[in-house]
UniProtKB/Swiss-Prot annotation:
Keywords: Ribonucleoprotein, Ribosomal protein. It comes from the Bacteria. The keyword ATP-binding does not apply. It comes from Kosmotoga olearia (strain ATCC BAA-1733 / DSM 21960 / TBF 19.5.1). Involved in the binding of tRNA to the ribosomes. GO terms for cellular component: ribonucleoprotein complex; ribosome. Belongs to the universal ribosomal protein uS10 family. SMART domains: Ribosomal_S10 (SM01403). NCBIfam families: PRK00596.1, rpsJ_bact. Part of the 30S ribosomal subunit. GO terms for biological process: translation. This is Small ribosomal subunit protein uS10.
Amino acid sequence: MAKQKIRIRLKAYDHRLLDASAKKIVEAVKMTNAKVSGPIPLPTERTLYTVLTSPHKYKDAREQFEKLVHKRLIEIIDPTPKTIDSLMKVDLPAGVDVEIKL
């Protein structure tokens, strides 16, 4: 018999917000006596943008901006209906993107 697993993938620009959200989810799942693996830090996605500071010439004068997307993975092994209900009730901040795979 295969074990059922729920994978929760969190993404955010701010790692402190992401870690606080992951902690809330883990606490909610542990209250229902389900096994939790994580939060597992995944590689940070880094996007670099290079822009000319001058509108016409001076190609040597450039400015660089970077966007970091931090990610975490939480696995819930053998969830119960009570676990799923507690996950639905967890209040997460607006800056965190959540993907759930069953």
